[in-house]
Design a protein with these regions (language model features):
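Glycan-recognition and catalytic cores of secretory/periplasmic carbohydrate-active enzymes
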Residues: 23-213
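Bacterial Sec-dependent N-terminal signal peptides
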Residues: 1-26
């Protein structure tokens, strides 16, 4: 009986070992499909807006005021002034573009650079260079702390993936402008210059500091 039990236990152990060794391999094909879809969308966008000298910011969508009130547990009178106007019917689902001075302007060229890095697709690289160069005037801009977002995502990735002699100068000049927003008395970088704020400082400042190093 003991021998039978031992044999059964041995057999179960062997089956467990074999099953552990023959686990199916993870299917990562969905990653490639996602990357292919993202790359195609990035290229399509690049082609469609190339003559505008603008950058894609978001897709225009509407909002349900009742839903917002339920989520915020507040009356709409307390926050409706802070909402953007509802897009018109012909604007819904369309791209919202922005100028090079918008705080999100570096994200699109940055996305092109990352897609190029992952695919090796030279068409993506060409578009990345074009949309990065579009941000050249930002090197003279002093009106926001978001210079890190704007320039690191674009020129920072360009320096990493396709370096040339002009990129470092753009990044240094922009970094100098970001340093210029530092106030010795307060020991902080001023976040922005609009509105009625005295000296706004938000956590995003930390994410822009990488440009200084």
């Amino acid at each position: 009986n003991n021998m039978k039990k031992n044999l059964v236990l041995l057999a179960l152990g062997a089956l467990t070992f074999v099953s552990c060794q023959t686990q199916p391999k993870e299917d990562y094909s969905w990653i490639k499909k996602g990357l292919d879809a993202a790359s195609a969308q990035l290229q399509l966008t690049a082609e469609e807006i190339s003559s505008t000298n603008m950058l894609p910011r978001s897709i225009r969508t509407g909002y349900d005021m009742n839903f917002l009130c339920r989520q915020l547990e507040r009356d709409s009178l307390t926050f409706k002034d802070s909402l953007r106007a509802q897009p018109t019917a012909d604007q819904l689902g369309k791209r919202r573009l922005c100028s090079v001075y918008d705080w999100t302007s570096g994200f699109y060229p940055g996305s092109l650079w990352y897609a190029y890095e992952l695919t090796g697709n030279d068409t993506l690289k060409t578009w990345a260079i074009q949309y990065t160069n579009l941000l050249n005037p930002v090197r003279y801009y002093t009106g926001t702390h978001d210079l890190g977002f704007m320039v690191n995502c674009s020129y920072g990735n360009a320096e990493r993936l396709a370096p040339n002699d002009t990129i470092a100068a753009v990044m240094k000049e922009t970094a100098d402008n970001l340093c210029g927003r530092f106030n010795d008395s307060i020991s902080a970088i001023r976040s922005w210059d609009f509105g009625t704020w005295n000296f706004p400082v938000i956590i995003d400042n930390m994410m822009n500091l990488d440009l200084l190093f």
